[in-house]
């Protein structure tokens, strides 16, 4: 997967074998119908859109940390968190049944209120990290607002805690630009520039420590029936990753997604 870093960091320690195993398990669950709505995992190529997220998260958030999976959806990131030794609290407006197929580990689900989609029914300073995996860009669609959601996230983070945001649509994405013009094609209604992200983080009192662009090539199309078989091959997935990385490095401004890590200050400002 393309990894277009704007704020350089030391390469994170990778646990590639574990990551590949987790992705493989999710692909198997998607194909077997064991995981509800795992559309992103209908092929190995599409599943690899998360392959860079796993080591990135581990690099910043130590094993055993208490993590809020904010907007947990079908539970795929909670699955990774549990398999990786984190203590997980999943928040979503609707329960999609992850409890029925989740791996073992410390886990609880906290439902939200559709009439009040912003408020987190959780105590202040409850978590070492909060993860948003394809969620922040959708809050307005459910009646929320990004700035208000970020204030709630800051409230439930402990001092020094981290907000890890993945799959935030890039305002200048070529994929989104084309999808926006194709009738019936899914695209994101809200996309973000770096300056917009920084303004939101500053207003919420968060300090950005990492920003990267990634994902030049499309992924989810490999889950379609005519490509699914080919997309299950590991060699094809690795080749697509390599091409994605090269094109993403050369044309980073047009990558589909943005990711960032931001920190809540360790002490309150005087």
Pin down the residues of each PLM region.
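A short SAM/SAH-binding and catalytic strip from SAM-dependent methyltransferases
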Residues: 129-143
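Alpha-helix N-cap/helix-start and coil->helix boundary motif
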Residues: 95, 136, 171-172
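Phosphate- and divalent-cation-binding pockets in alpha/beta enzyme and binding domains
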Residues: 76, 80, 138, 174
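Short glycine-centered segments of the SAM/dcSAM-binding site in methyltransferase folds
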Residues: 66, 160-162
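S-adenosyl-L-methionine-dependent methyltransferase catalytic module, highlighting the catalytic core
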Residues: 111, 140-152, 162-266
